């Protein structure tokens, strides 16, 4: 199971250098519902900053819809909220805490399947490592 945060999804979407999540047929890709908001906001930010024109934005939004359809998205439920508001032992931003807490929940439900936390965000990687998750991508 591969948990992908917004930075990993965006690297796939924009084909950025520096590697991304290696996708293999049959991979179980998961994330938080939060990833939808973060990634659509990022595409809109690219448009507003003049890096995407209207046609490019429409294509990227369609590609993003297709990419997100490959993910099983977990709800931000009471477990996630309680874990995210708890102490991490390292400095953690709110959205990063939600991603890490969601990954912890999914790892606990994985029924023997190993979870890898994919991110290209150093601070989020540190937060995930502080909670014992296996981190890839940074």
Where are these regions (language model features)?
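Alpha-helical elements of the RecA-like P-loop NTPase motor core of helicases
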Residues: 11, 82, 125-129
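Acidic, PIN/NYN-like endoribonuclease modules and their adjacent C-terminal/linker elements
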Residues: 1, 32, 105-138
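Short, well-structured N-terminal submotif of metal-dependent ribonuclease cores
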Residues: 1-37, 46-59
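Active-site neighborhoods of divalent-metal-dependent phosphate/nucleic-acid chemistry enzymes
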Residues: 70-123
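Alpha-helical scaffold domains
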Residues: 25, 67, 73, 79-81, ...
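Helix-adjacent hinge/juxtasegments
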Residues: 50-76
């Amino acid at each position: 199971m591969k948990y992908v945060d917004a930075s990993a999804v965006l690297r796939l979407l924009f084909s950025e250098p520096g590697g991304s999540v290696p996708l293999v047929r049959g991979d179980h890709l998961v994330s938080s519902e939060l990833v939808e908001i973060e990634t659509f906001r990022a595409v809109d930010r690219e448009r507003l900053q003049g890096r995407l024109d209207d046609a490019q934005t429409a294509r990227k939004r369609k590609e993003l819809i297709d990419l997100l359809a490959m993910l099983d998205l977990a709800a931000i439920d009471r477990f996630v909220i309680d874990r995210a508001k708890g102490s991490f032992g390292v400095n953690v931003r709110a959205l990063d805490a939600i991603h890490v807490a969601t990954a912890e929940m999914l790892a606990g439900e994985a029924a023997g399947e190993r979870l890898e936390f994919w991110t290209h965000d150093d601070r989020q990687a540190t937060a995930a490592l502080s909670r014992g998750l296996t981190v890839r991508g940074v």
